[in-house]
């Protein structure tokens, strides 16, 4: 998790269990991560349900939510089904492409 927060513009990050919305690890501040984890669990579930309904048999690499002042990246873990990385970035200070790449690298290296 420390590696995620080192990303330029990163405010906070969490590892979330999408089966129950619980945070398994977190770092940083600026967002109520308990509330965000629960809400983003619903986002992940809704997208997966929609993909099944559409017959799409692919994986979600990441989900990007763009706000006026922030980026929120949700990255389901390919190697550990049911978990996702949640990263919040200050839009004015971050590089979205580099942050997405960092989330991908952390996902590959993260031991759960």
Predicted region positions:
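Non-catalytic interaction/Regulatory regions outside core domains
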Residues: 1-13, 18-112
């Amino acid at each position: 998790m420390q590696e995620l927060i080192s990303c330029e513009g990163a405010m906070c990050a969490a590892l979330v269990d999408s089966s129950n919305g619980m945070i398994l690890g977190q770092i940083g501040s600026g967002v109520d991560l308990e509330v965000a984890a629960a809400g983003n669990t619903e986002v992940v579930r809704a997208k997966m349900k929609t993909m099944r309904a559409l017959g799409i048999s692919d994986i979600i690499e990441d989900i990007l939510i763009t706000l006026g002042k922030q980026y929120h990246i949700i990255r389901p873990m390919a190697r550990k089904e049911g978990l996702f990385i949640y990263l919040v970035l200050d839009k004015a200070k971050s590089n979205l492409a580099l942050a997405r790449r960092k989330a991908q690298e952390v996902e590959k290296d993260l031991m759960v």
